[in-house]
Swiss-Prot record:
Organism of derivation: Methanocella arvoryzae (strain DSM 22066 / NBRC 105507 / MRE50)
GO terms for cellular component: ribonucleoprotein complex; ribosome
UniProtKB keywords: Ribonucleoprotein, Ribosomal protein, RNA-binding, rRNA-binding
HAMAP family noted in UniProt: Ribosomal_uS11
GO biological process: translation
Coiled-coil region list: none
Protein name: Small ribosomal subunit protein uS11
Lineage: Archaea, Methanobacteriati, Methanobacteriota, Stenosarchaea group, Methanomicrobia
């Protein structure tokens, strides 16, 4: 019996805030980084680093790099700043996922790994909250 060619998977870690988007692709263990890019590598203005356009360009660059290394599919882990900060991902997250799929990569699972505090440090605004 002939051996079936092994389907190679990786994990795409997408960190998306309202200031930047960072995409890092690692092997399944997370030990080896295969490709890495951030908003500042594809756009000139700081204010555009978190934009969906920048995320699309980043995802295309990353997809090219990992396809060259023989990766055919990715599991996606989306992360927002979390903790005492914003718990919803920025505008670049969805564009990055869509762009990875459009680049011809198989999408496995998509999970949200935003850190959630279990009563950690005091939230900004102090004891009485933000008074407007």
């Amino acid at each position: 019996m002939a051996d079936q060619p092994q389907f190679k998977w990786a994990i795409a870690h997408i960190f998306s805030s309202f200031n930047n988007t960072i995409i890092t692709v690692t092997d399944l263990t997370g030990a080896e980084t295969l490709a890495k890019t951030s908003g500042g590598m594809v756009v000139k203005q700081d204010r555009n680093e978190s934009s969906p356009y920048a995320a699309m360009q980043m995802a295309m660059n990353v997809a090219e790099q990992i396809k060259a290394k023989g990766i055919q599919g990715v599991h996606i882990r989306v992360r927002a700043p979390g903790g005492n900060h914003q718990r919803s991902p920025g505008p670049g997250a969805q564009a990055a996922i869509r762009s990875l799929a459009r680049a011809g990569l198989r999408i496995g699972r998509i999970e949200d790994v935003t850190p959630i505090p279990h009563d950690g440090t005091r939230a900004p605004g102090g004891k009485r909250g933000r008074r407007v």
